[in-house]
């Protein structure tokens, strides 16, 4: 695939207009705002930095690297083990439901784009969008580092725009937050991708509590 086309497809994967429910989930932020843990843009930035460092860098990116290698090797057994590990790291029913819902939605796109995707891989991709991204990245010859940039930007933008609705703060503040969070992400992405097996795992008790409490929150803008 020519390089310009790869770049355009990478931008398409980063777009939050993809019909995978990117704006439908708050990952506990809605309860954190309700509880008074996140009251302004500075508190949101601190909250999101913690999620990035203690969850996204500790689980999502290391597992993306392993799923990518499994897809390169055509090894669905290895991909299945890491997909199951990813789901086990989602500490609440809400987070596991989000993972599976986004995976199922992304797989519908994947099958439309690549109808030759084998059935055993489709089944795995339905469990997690991360698995689908890895498979598609290998098929489209997009490097794992470029794929990680796309995934990270989409995650950051979704979180910041959720904050616009919930905290709230304005659009100018949102763009400043995206720039600062992206700078932090870019500085640490490579080391996160190189995380050894024994170091994979997250410890975000406040985020887990917020997600669990959000399941029964009286009034919600976001899915549970």
UniProtKB/Swiss-Prot annotation:
Domain of life assignment: Bacteria
Coarse class of the protein's main subcellular location: cytoplasm
Subunit (UniProt): UreD, UreF and UreG form a complex that acts as a GTP-hydrolysis-dependent molecular chaperone, activating the urease apoprotein by helping to assemble the nickel containing metallocenter of UreC. The UreE protein probably delivers the nickel.
GO molecular function: nickel cation binding
Organism: Escherichia coli O157:H7
Gene Ontology CC, one term: cytoplasm
Family label: Belongs to the UreF family.
Keywords: Chaperone, Cytoplasm, Nickel insertion
Protein name, entry field: Urease accessory protein UreF
Subcellular compartments: Cytoplasm
Protein's UniProt keywords contain Chaperone: yes
Gene responsible for this protein: ureF1
InterPro entries xref list: UreF (IPR002639), UreF_sf (IPR038277)
Free-text function comment from the UniProt entry: Required for maturation of urease via the functional incorporation of the urease nickel metallocenter.
Gene3D superfamilies the UniProt entry points to: Urease accessory protein UreF (1.10.4190.10)
């Amino acid at each position: 695939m020519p390089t310009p086309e790869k770049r355009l497809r990478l931008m398409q994967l980063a777009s939050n207009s993809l019909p995978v429910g990117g704006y439908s989930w708050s990952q506990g932020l809605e309860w954190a705002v309700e509880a008074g843990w996140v009251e302004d843009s500075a508190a949101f930035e601190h909250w999101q930095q913690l999620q990035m460092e203690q969850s996204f860098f500790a689980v999502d990116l290391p597992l993306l690297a392993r799923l990518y290698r499994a897809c390169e090797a055509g090894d669905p057994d290895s991909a299945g083990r890491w997909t199951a590990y990813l789901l086990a790291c989602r500490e609440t029913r809400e987070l596991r439901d989000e993972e599976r819902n986004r995976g199922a939605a992304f797989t519908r796109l994947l099958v439309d784009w690549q109808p030759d995707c084998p059935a055993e891989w489709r089944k795995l991709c339905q469990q997690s969008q991360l698995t689908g991204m890895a498979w598609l990245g290998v098929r489209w010859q997009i490097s794992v580092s470029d794929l990680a940039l796309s995934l990270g930007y989409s995650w950051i933008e979704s979180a910041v725009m959720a904050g616009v609705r919930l905290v709230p703060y304005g659009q100018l503040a949102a763009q400043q937050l995206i720039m600062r969070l992206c700078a932090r992400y870019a500085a640490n992405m490579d080391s996160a991708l190189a995380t050894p097996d024994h170091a994979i795992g997250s410890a975000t008790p406040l985020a887990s509590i917020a997600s669990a409490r959000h399941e029964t929150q009286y009034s919600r803008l976001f899915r549970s």
